[in-house]
Structure formats: structure tokens, C-alpha cells
Amino acid sequence: MPTQKAEATWHGSFREGEGKMRLGSGAFEGGYSYRSRMEEGPGTNPEELLGAAHAGCFSMSLARRLEAAGYPPERVHTEARVRFGREGEGYAISRIDLRTEAEVPGASEEVFLEKAEAAKRDCAISKALAGVGEINLEARLVQHAE
């Protein structure tokens, strides 16, 4: 199995400093700061990138499960909302809400929801985030326009 790489550099104090995060593939490099993480400042933050990773992993896991059941999806779109804040003397992710919708010709709502729950439980990022208090899922099957 491949090993993926990412890196981050931080310069300065917690509140006044700034940094850059970069993916090993070179597909993304972005700045982050106290303001981008704790307020609504410009830039990205670790939780936003974690949300993107979770949404991507979940979408692929759901597509794999649907295809294995005989219903290859035309499209899966997932949004992850990551709740992050103070916990004790530090910070923690307390909750992740996944919202997904998919166009899956021929799939019933029951099959779709079963596969979505399994993908939420078993995708690699969900497993890595086992310490998060809640990972919730809202899934919607979009009817394919004929």
C-alpha cells in the first residue's frame, strides 16, 4: 500500500504566526493562520483539509459499495462539516456531519442508505477519526432524469 505525505511549516507565535501546508503530490499548497483556523480569516486550516479528505474518502467508498451491488453511480457529491473548538486545555474535533447526494440509476432508497451507512462506518478516514464524538450522515438519493 502506498504511503502518502503532507507537510506543514509554522512561523511565529500561536496567535500572530502563519504557516503553509502542502500535499506531497503538489496538488495543493495553502496558507493558514490563527485567523483562518479560529475566526473567519482568509486561508485554510487543518480541519477544512480533514473535511475534504473525509468527504473524498466517503464518496469513493460509497461508489465502490454501490458498484459492487450492481449500481454504479453517475455522481456522488459529499460535503463534510467539521466542528472544532476548545476541549479542556486544548482543542478537539467534536463532530463531523457528512451530507451526501448521489445519482445512482436503478438503486432503491433502501440499498442506497445501507451502502451510505456502511461507507460512513468503514471508509479509511472515518476509521482514522474514531476518536471524534459524532460522525453523522445525511444521505439523499437523487432520481436520475431519463
Where are these regions (language model features)?
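Extended beta-strand/beta-hairpin segments
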Residues: M1-A52, G56-E146
